[in-house]
Amino acid sequence: VLGFAAGGLFDGILLHQILQWHHLLSLVPGVAGLREQVLWDGYLHAFMYVAAGIRLAGLWRARAQLEGKRWRSLVGILLLGFAAWHTIDALVSHWWLGIHRIRIDSPDPLIWDLLWLGVFGLVPAIAGALLLRKPPSDPRRMRSGRAILPLMIATLALAAW
């Protein structure tokens, strides 16, 4: 839940506020005014803050049980949640409901949707899954596993180019 909330906050703050590429309901008829768009963005952010706060409180309460746990597990779960936000946002908001796209002003918004999904959905999901894997006992396997992420990033960059 914490990674999911972080993904929603990252998306909302970067895309809605800083870059201003879209708002939550940019493509919804009848929600055209900037004031209304920003209001709905605020509702999304408030929901994400509440979700993050609840999860942080849960982590605080469970801190004694978490002592000695591997940091890899926590970071891996956070990355999977972050990736889940971007994957669900792309599938539901962009393609199923059609309430917004990553770059509305683009002549081909699908390219931006796919690039965003790859960089902030696929890459964190792979990194999170790799962190959650049991470390291999053979050091040669460990080195080959480390090479997968840079290769995936290079492949996505070439595909986008």
Residue positions per predicted region:
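Alpha-helical transmembrane segments and their helix-start/interface "positive-inside/aromatic belt" motifs
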Residues: V1-A5, G68-I77, G145-L149
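Hydrophobic cores of alpha-helical transmembrane segments in multi-pass integral membrane proteins
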Residues: V1-I13, Y43-L56, G81-H86, L122
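C-terminal TM-helix exit segments that contain a strictly Trp-centered aromatic cap at the helix terminus
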Residues: A6-Q17, F82-W96, A157-W161
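Interfacial loop at the N-terminal end of multi-pass membrane proteins
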Residues: F10-W40
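Interfacial helix-loop-helix junctions of multi-pass membrane proteins
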Residues: L15-L25, A90-D113
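Membrane-interface loop-to-helix entry segments
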Residues: A32-I54, D108-A129
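Membrane-interface helix-boundary motifs at transmembrane edges
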Residues: A62-R72, K134-S144
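Internal/C-terminal transmembrane anchor helices
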Residues: R141-W161
